[in-house]
């Protein structure tokens, strides 16, 4: 604590519909890639903490899965429960919306956050894409009318526009507390978890329109030998056809997935990485609560 500034620390939930820019926002605030991103909805499946300590202020961000209407599989129910649970026991809630469109799933999130009793901030994303800034004003006014107790901040998560103002507003609302984490800690997640997420991100980016959503990644080995990290990752799918898609013609696609994931791992872990990937069919895992628990999806 400095003479004029109290030490502040608290939890900040980042919520919104799928693919609205929540993970991109977290990565930009942290100044490094922690949460995986892609253009595909439901890229984020787990709540994850991203911790930023700056001077007397420690903000502990909770990146959440996008709230969505699909509830037909156990995996969908898990993600929706995770996102809703993040609204409880946090000090600040950031509701991320996309300036360019409003969907039924945005409305679903709005109906959840209207019951938030603590500080609520609406982060209006992608405002850098507007040719006429005057067009933004009616949209901001409409949001303010929907959530009159919220503060509205236009941002660009991708470009970093106005994030300093957003962070200053968050810091103002954090309670006076000693810091909960060491200054150099940036997440609560293990290296094994982060490695699995990087592989899954590369799969989602490589597959495009062919993407089978019933994919998960399990790290079977994570071992340091000298200056080299040896990582063995198992990619689980539900059907033989999905396995063929991931492997690709003569194994070319899985080679690209492995190469791209390895490069990001070497940056994240600051070490040389030897990465081996396997693909295995496990039918129905995404709707099997026991299988989901064994794969690290927690309480269902």
Swiss-Prot record:
The KH type-2 domain covers 199-283
What is a GO molecular function of this protein? Answer: small ribosomal subunit rRNA binding
Where in the sequence is the signal peptide annotated?
none
**What Gene Ontology cellular component terms go with this record?**
cytosol; plasma membrane
Please list the residue ranges annotated as the Era-type G domain: 8-176
Q: Where is this region: G1?
A: 16-23
Q: Positions of the region G5?
A: 155-157
Q: How does it sit in the membrane?
A: Peripheral membrane protein
Its subcellular locations are: Cytoplasm; Cell inner membrane
Quote the InterPro entries the UniProt record gives. Answer: G_ERA_dom, GTP-bd, GTPase_Era-like, KH_dom-like_a/b, KH_dom_type_2, KH_sf_prok-type, P-loop_NTPase, Small_GTP-bd
* UniProt region (G3), positions on chain: 63-66
In terms of SUPFAM superfamilies, this protein maps to: P-loop containing nucleoside triphosphate hydrolases, Prokaryotic type KH domain (KH-domain type II)
Q: NCBIfam families, per this entry?
A: era (TIGR00436), PRK00089.1 (NF000908), small_GTP (TIGR00231)
Family in the record: Belongs to the TRAFAC class TrmE-Era-EngA-EngB-Septin-like GTPase superfamily. Era GTPase family.
This chain belongs to the protein called GTPase Era
Source species, please?
Pseudomonas putida (strain W619)
- Gene name on record? era
